[in-house]
């Protein structure tokens, strides 16, 4: 063990834990990341699928890694490269497809095939979404205040929050109507929001996918419109709204973070599950590992989810009953599944022509928002989705390091999938998804 006493110990080596550790180490603190696996990365890990094939185990594309984090942690210095892709597509059962391109004119012509009105409306839609992104982005870096608290810190936080909107108003950015529109947008379903702009089912379905992917929401769910923003506010190489592949898989991100941490004197203690957080006089002061070792720290950060933190590694006696019950009743339900497929060759799609830039990005299988909501209804009722929403990509087109020469790797993300206690039933839904792919 490198040290037994630190300024800060971080339980869990996912990308959030590593980012926190890197900033603290850069500030001169003695930091340790404690990870149960023999490797760090959490949901951003690159693993070997078959000899020669690399796959991203969970997350699969990159956009929301903030550019300031990229710069501050010098991630490019430690080998991180994001490769942008130029388009995406939704494939329909009748052989048609809607392609979404980063090029304005190509995108206009693609939408106009389905609706000239929608092609005209898309520019207004894009401007409105970008306006919401500009409002939200600064808030993501603010610590949210507790509106029920009278602590000076929270009161000051609320004042800062109010000042932010007041300043926007003074600059002509947010008037009374704009504030109303923003609050309305945050609470809308993505279905209702898109209905205000578009008439084509495939255009609406393509855009709605960004609001439900990786969530336990359907396109009719209130609040799903807000999720859409997270797929527009990211950027790659300064291009806002762009997406890309991390060269070598998503694990290259956390590998670069780990290198940055070590370069600033931080430690990574891998293969060391934490079984208990030590608490004395209502303050955490260390952890106990599975092998019985103890690591002490002045401050403790948990990169685990709220349930694992307070129900698994903190003893119940250390928590107020109302807090314990609130955490126990907090819903965390998985709704997504992922297939990683090694390919002998590139698929030949019935709809997307060979060489079309739309084929380099994310490819969706769905017919309409109504079909997506039906898949969500199946999941809510405890059934496997009969017509699941599929979001797939082939990173090896842009990044040949992911597969042997001439071969390819396909990532397939599926909405909606039953929770882990039903994994014994996976063969049938996996066959269904594979059949959907083969039909395209």
Q: Which stretches of residues belong to each language-model region?
A:
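N-terminal glycine-rich phosphate/pyrophosphate-binding loop and immediately adjacent elements
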Residues: 2-154
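A short, glycine/Asx- and small/polar-enriched loop/turn
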Residues: 94-95, 218-222, 278-285, 406-408
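Short coil-to-beta-strand
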Residues: 99, 222-229, 405-414
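Helix-rich C-terminal "cap"/substrate-channel and partner-interaction subdomain
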Residues: 124-160, 308, 388-420, 424
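Active-site/ligand-binding neighborhood in enzyme catalytic cores
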Residues: 130-264
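Mid-domain catalytic core of redox enzymes
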Residues: 240-247, 273-404
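A conserved beta-strand/loop element that lines the FAD pocket in flavoprotein oxidoreductases
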Residues: 260-274
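Single conserved hydrophobic/aromatic residue that forms the stacking wall/gate
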Residues: 421-440
């Amino acid at each position: 063990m490198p040290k037994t006493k630190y300024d800060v110990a971080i339980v869990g080596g996912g990308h959030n834990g590593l980012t926190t550790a890197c900033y603290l180490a850069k500030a001169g603190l003695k930091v340790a990341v404690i990870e149960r696996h023999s490797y760090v990365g959490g949901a951003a890990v690159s693993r070997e699928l078959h000899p020669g094939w690399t796959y991203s185990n969970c997350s699969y594309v990159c956009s929301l890694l903030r550019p300031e984090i990229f710069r501050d942690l010098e991630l490019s210095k430690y080998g991180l490269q994001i490769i942008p892709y130029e388009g995406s597509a939704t494939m329909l059962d009748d052989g048609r497809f809607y392609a979404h391109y980063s090029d304005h004119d190509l995108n206009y012509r693609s939408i106009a095939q389905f609706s000239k009105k929608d092609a005209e409306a898309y520019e207004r839609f894009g401007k409105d979404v970008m306006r919401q992104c500009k409002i939200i982005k600064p808030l993501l870096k603010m610590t949210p205040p507790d509106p029920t608290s009278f602590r000076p810190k929270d009161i000051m936080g609320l004042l800062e929050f109010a000042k932010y909107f007041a300043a926007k108003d003074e600059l002509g950015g947010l008037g009374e109507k704009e504030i109303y529109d923003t609050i309305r947008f945050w609470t809308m379903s993505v279905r209702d929001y898109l209905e205000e702009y578009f008439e084509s089912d495939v255009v609406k379905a393509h855009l709605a996918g960004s609001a439900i992917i990786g969530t336990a929401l359907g396109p009719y769910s209130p609040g799903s419109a807000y999720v859409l923003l997270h797929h527009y506010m990211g950027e790659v190489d300064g291009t806002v709204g762009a997406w890309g592949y991390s060269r070598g898989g998503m694990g290259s991100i956390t590998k670069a973070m780990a290198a940055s941490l070590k370069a600033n004197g931080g430690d990574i203690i891998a293969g060391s599950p934490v079984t208990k957080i030590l608490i004395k006089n209502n303050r955490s002061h260390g952890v106990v590992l599975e092998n019985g070792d103890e690591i002490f720290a002045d401050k403790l950060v948990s990169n685990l989810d709220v349930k694992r933190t307070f129900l698994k590694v903190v003893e119940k006696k250390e928590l107020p009953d109302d807090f314990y019950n609130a955490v126990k009743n907090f819903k965390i339900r998985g709704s997504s599944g992922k297939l990683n497929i090694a390919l002998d060759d590139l698929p030949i799609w019935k709809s997307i022509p060979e060489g079309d830039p739309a084929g380099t990005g994310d490819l969706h299988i769905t017919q309409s928002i109504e079909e997506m909501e039906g898949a969500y209804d199946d999941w809510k009722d405890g059934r496997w989705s009969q017509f699941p929403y599929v979001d797939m990509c082939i990173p090896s087109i842009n990044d040949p390091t992911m597969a042997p020469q001439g071969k390819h790797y396909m990532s397939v993300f599926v909405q909606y999938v039953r929770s882990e206690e039903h994994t014994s039933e996976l063969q049938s839904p996996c066959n269904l998804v594979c059949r959907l792919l083969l039909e395209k």
